[in-house]
Amino acid sequence: PSLQAHLQALQAVQREVWKPLAAAYQDQQDQPVIPHPFRVGDTVWVRRHQTKNLEPRWKGPYTVLLTTPTALKVDGIAAWIHAAHVKAATTPPAGTASGPTWKVQRSQNPLKIRLTRGAP
């Protein structure tokens, strides 16, 4: 069998498999993807992946600075964190001290912003 015969056979198999696959994925496309519930300013706990003996599994709470549909940027951690690795922290009672405030400064470049930390 030549290369052309193999490619034609592969194309025939692809045609047979394509329609059932397209129908299966069409059902999933009808359901909207729901992003995580976290918003800027929320407080979250971050999962600690490697815990030592008697060490808590969650660290924080941290304040959410930026969000994407799948990840969060939190105060105090340089890397972005996937939304599956955080959970919401309970809100502190009224009248308790809060964390620092943050100010967003835009630049000429639409892909750059500057975050500055203010006094609590």
Swiss-Prot record:
Protein name, entry field: Retrovirus-related Pol polyprotein
InterPro entries in the record: MLVIN_C
Top-rank taxon, per record: Eukaryota
Key word Repressor present: no
Main EC class the enzyme belongs to: transferase
Region of interest (Disordered), ranges: 90-109
Reactions the enzyme catalyzes: DNA(n) + a 2'-deoxyribonucleoside 5'-triphosphate = DNA(n+1) + diphosphate
A single GO molecular function term of this UniProt record: endonuclease activity
Gene source species: Mus musculus
Keyword Hydrolase among UniProt keywords: yes
Keywords: Endonuclease, Hydrolase, Nuclease, Nucleotidyltransferase, RNA-directed DNA polymerase, Transferase
Amino acid composition bias (Low complexity), ranges on this chain: 90-101
EC number: 2.7.7.49
